[in-house]
UniProtKB/Swiss-Prot annotation:
Protein family per UniProt: Belongs to the histone H2B family.
Coiled coil: none
Name of the featured protein: Histone H2B 1/2/3/4/6
Gene, per the UniProt record: H2B-I
Assembly notes: The nucleosome is a histone octamer containing two molecules each of H2A, H2B, H3 and H4 assembled in one H3-H4 heterotetramer and two H2A-H2B heterodimers. The octamer wraps approximately 147 bp of DNA.
Cross-link (Glycyl lysine isopeptide (Lys-Gly) (interchain with G-Cter in ubiquitin)): 121
UniProt source species: Gallus gallus (Chicken)
Modification Phosphoserine, positions: 15
Entries under SUPFAM superfamilies matching the protein: Histone-fold (SSF47113)
Composition skew (Low complexity), residue ranges: 1-12
Length: 126
């Protein structure tokens, strides 16, 4: 009985082998599309609060989603407030009011004080 031909063993799961493709003349290399996220900022805040703690990519994805959600809610509420008051510009006042409306009690107070601090720091650096 003939033995089946042995083929090269399949690469192990997770092995990273570079696959090189020859590029023809005139072909343009495709640039990787940039994906914006808040991950570097979340990481910086994490290191300020808990310097010895890390974060998984799944948790980072959740945090990114959370920040995007809060951003959209605040922007939407601020836009509504500007529209109600017949204003065409969203100022720090609309943002502050939107934060007070959206966030509960103590959290809103802390957010407003941190926001005021950030705006003051920005205007003084100009």
């Amino acid at each position: 009985m003939p033995e089946p031909a042995k083929s090269a063993p399949a690469p192990k799961k997770g092995s990273k082998k570079a696959v090189t493709k020859t590029q023809k003349k005139g072909d343009k290399k495709r640039k990787k599309s940039r994906k914006e996220s808040y991950s570097i900022y979340v990481y910086k805040v994490l290191k300020q609060v808990h310097p010895d703690t890390g974060i998984s990519s799944k948790a980072m994805g959740i945090m990114n989603s959370f920040v995007n959600d809060i951003f959209e809610r605040i922007a939407g509420e601020a836009s509504r407030l500007a529209h109600y008051n017949k204003r065409s510009t969203i100022t720090s006042r609309e943002i502050q009011t939107a934060v007070r409306l959206l966030l509960p009690g103590e959290l809103a107070k802390h957010a407003v004080s941190e926001g005021t601090k950030a705006v003051t720091k920005y205007t003084s650096s100009k």
